[in-house]
């Protein structure tokens, strides 16, 4: 899955190649500073070892560094973090391929207007998008009444396919 591989900086792509090759099974990738990389798949959770291979236990797994997180954020923001300030303030970035990248760090507040930005980002959660053709086929006819599209609210817990349905 090329769009998944392009999330990562060029110099780290060889490390992520196996995960990208298994893209159709990957649901989420979790990167936390000083913690093992976790790859959540449709078949279970795995940890990445230092060569990018998958293993079932965290022992000897690759530990994410602050530098890796910083380089990833810079890459995702095309080296212009300020240009992405609004998205970062929302807590996530959306990248090519529809993948969503959640960010967690230290909140910087701005007077009474709320959150200004995040700094010291230490956790990145990559939600891998999957196109499922025909996902809305059963529900689409129910959204129309006498040829007019009806106001609709789609509600479900995280990870239950709201975005997939809309695609």
What are these regions (language model features)?
Residues 151:
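Walker A (P-loop) ATP-phosphate-binding motif of ABC ATPase nucleotide-binding domains
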Residues 71, 75, 79-148:
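P-loop NTP-binding catalytic core
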Residues 165:
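Hydrophobic positions on the alpha1 helix immediately C-terminal to the Walker A/P-loop
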Residues 154:
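Hydrophobic anchor at the beta1->P-loop junction of P-loop NTPases
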Residues 158:
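The conserved Walker
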Residues 1-96:
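N-terminal accessory targeting/assembly segments
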Residues 162:
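Conserved lysine of the Walker
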